UniProtKB/Swiss-Prot annotation:
The HXXXXD motif is essential for acyltransferase activity and may constitute the binding site for the phosphate moiety of the glycerol-3-phosphate. Keywords: Acyltransferase, Endoplasmic reticulum, Glycoprotein, Lipid biosynthesis, Lipid metabolism, Membrane, Phospholipid biosynthesis, Phospholipid metabolism, Signal, Transferase, Transmembrane, Transmembrane helix. InterPro entries: LPCAT1-like, Plipid/glycerol_acylTrfase. The gene is GPAT4. It is an enzyme of class 2 (transferase). The keyword Nucleotide-binding does not apply. Pathway: Phospholipid metabolism; CDP-diacylglycerol biosynthesis; CDP-diacylglycerol from sn-glycerol 3-phosphate: step 1/3. It is a multi-pass membrane protein. The chain crosses the membrane at residues 156-176, 180-200. This is Glycerol-3-phosphate acyltransferase 4. Converts glycerol-3-phosphate to 1-acyl-sn-glycerol-3-phosphate (lysophosphatidic acid or LPA) by incorporating an acyl moiety at the sn-1 position of the glycerol backbone. Active against both saturated and unsaturated long-chain fatty acyl-CoAs. Protects cells against lipotoxicity. One of its GO terms (cellular component) is endoplasmic reticulum. It comes from Pongo abelii. It catalyses: sn-glycerol 3-phosphate + an acyl-CoA = a 1-acyl-sn-glycero-3-phosphate + CoA; dodecanoyl-CoA + sn-glycerol 3-phosphate = 1-dodecanoyl-sn-glycerol 3-phosphate + CoA; sn-glycerol 3-phosphate + hexadecanoyl-CoA = 1-hexadecanoyl-sn-glycero-3-phosphate + CoA; sn-glycerol 3-phosphate + octadecanoyl-CoA = 1-octadecanoyl-sn-glycero-3-phosphate + CoA.
Length: 456
């Protein structure tokens, strides 16, 4: 039998005591408050401390740049080209006006100078494409001590380097193990809890247990990301029989919203860890998972959504109509399907603060586990959630117009750019219809001029 030396025995005892104390602190200050939705304000104090450190780091970099007579790089959040919201016809008329002394009424159907408009638009798109840059991480104006990829790294002083090294130790040696423990706890409880609840007979007790299992697990997962969430206008929270639509940045959007409400969810089938969670959740709650590539699945989803919203006793449905993750600088085209079924729509705007950590999931670059590890090694996830007043489809509106109206309201409230482009361009080539649209607009302008002159 192997015997421990006194010194080894002391180390084992100290390790056991340390783990017991750590687990007790974890239980008392994080897990139990998460279960009951209580906060001690530790995360907000942590956020305020980080803001002071970031401000000091920015001042140090500015001072270093001034000493070397350099100018700090400032990213252009709205693009590098100033663009006014003008139509094709107005811009072509402006080019004709500046290049010809003739009156516009006497101009022919086509002028050679019109070519310059299309050449300029092509060059602008190459230099500053407003679509594809929505599928990459948002640039920061100042360094957030997460990496040395900031353009101003050459102005980092010795003090900042030491601070960065200390930050790495804190994030990887303290925060990461703590967050992994919390995430494992939350996900395990969610999978086990929803599986057990799924065996209960349908009724109020099953609904009660399902609701509280979901809320408890999502709140623990929120703590695993050190998420600091501010909810606004909670009186507008989605109600039964309605549809909750929100802009989509990341899979953690679900955790952010579901930690403050109970939803039936609609989403694409995933594999891996996400697939395990989806299969467990659907046992306890009527979530709808579908395969995007299957046409019959889409028709089935539309039918199930219609049946769901007709029953006012059923949970509100949570949908992300963009259909893909956008980097939280804009809102892209909403798919019209969820706006065709005639239900009350509850818009929700979600805005993340990128200086604490980039919440955007670039699914073409990172898998789910890799993405979660990136989140858990960031400083925190800080975001604001606005519940907007419910909206209904007007008599003279079609589904596309209604979807655009809801999208505009979300973009306006969240301070996001409202784009008409389809987020599906993230995975697909530009359709010919987009190219033909510009040709149609130009042809309409030419034909219109010709008809006007024929009448005269």
């Amino acid at each position: 039998m192997f015997l421990l030396l006194p010194f080894d025995s002391l180390i084992v005892n100290l390790l056991g005591i340390s783990l017991t104390v750590l687990f007790t602190l974890l239980l008392v200050f994080i897990i139990v408050p998460a279960i009951f939705g209580v906060s001690f304000g530790i995360r907000k104090l942590y956020m305020k401390t980080l803001l002071k450190i970031f401000a000091w780091a920015t001042l140090r970099m500015e001072r270093g740049a001034k000493e070397k007579n350099h100018q700090l790089y400032k990213p252009y959040t709205n693009g590098i080209i100033a663009k006014d919201p003008t139509s094709l016809e107005e811009e072509i008329k402006e080019i004709r006006r500046s290049g010809s002394s003739k009156a516009l009424d006497n101009t022919p159907e086509f002028e050679l100078s019109d070519i310059f408009y299309f050449c300029r638009k092509g060059m602008e798109t190459i230099m500053d494409d407003e679509v594809t840059k929505r599928f990459s991480a948002e640039e920061l104006e100042s360094w957030n001590l997460l990496s040395r990829t900031n353009y101003n790294f050459q102005y980092i002083s010795l003090r900042l380097t030491v601070l960065w090294g200390l930050g790495v130790l804190i994030r990887y040696c303290f925060l990461l193990p703590l967050r992994i423990a919390l995430a494992f706890t939350g996900i395990s409880l969610l999978v086990v809890g929803t599986t057990v609840v799924g065996y209960l007979p349908n009724g109020r007790f099953k609904e009660f247990m399902s609701k509280h299992v979901h809320l408890m697990c999502y709140r623990i997962c929120v703590r695993a990301l050190t998420a600091i969430i501010t909810y606004h206008d909670r009186e507008n929270r989605p109600r039964n029989g309605g549809i909750c639509v929100a802009n989509h940045t990341s899979p953690i959007d679900v955790i952010i919203l579901a930690s403050d409400g109970y939803y039936a969810m609609v989403g694409q089938v995933h594999g891996g860890l996400m697939g395990v969670i989806q299969r467990a959740m659907v046992k306890a709650c009527p979530h709808v998972w579908f395969e995007r590539s299957e046409v019959k699945d889409r028709h089935l989803v539309a039918k199930r959504l219609t049946e769901h919203v007709q029953d006012k006793s059923k949970l509100p449905i949570l949908i992300f109509p963009e259909g893909t993750c956008i980097n939280n600088t804009s809102v892209m085209m909403f798919k019209k399907g969820s706006f065709e079924i005639g239900a009350t729509v509850y818009p929700v705007a979600i805005k993340y603060d990128p200086q604490f950590g980039d919440a955007f999931w670039n699914s073409s670059k990172y898998g789910m586990v890799t993405y979660l590890l990136r989140m858990m090694t960031s400083w925190a996830i800080v975001c604001s959630v606005w519940y907007l007043p419910p909206m209904t489809r007007e008599a003279d509106e079609d589904a596309v117009q209604f979807a655009n109206r809801v999208k505009s309201a979300i973009a306006r409230q969240g301070g996001l750019v409202d784009l008409l482009w389809d987020g599906g361009l993230k995975r697909e080539k530009v359709k010919d219809t987009f190219k033909e649209e510009q040709q149609k607009l130009y042809s309409k302008m030419i034909v219109g001029n010709h008809k006007d002159r024929s009448r005269s």
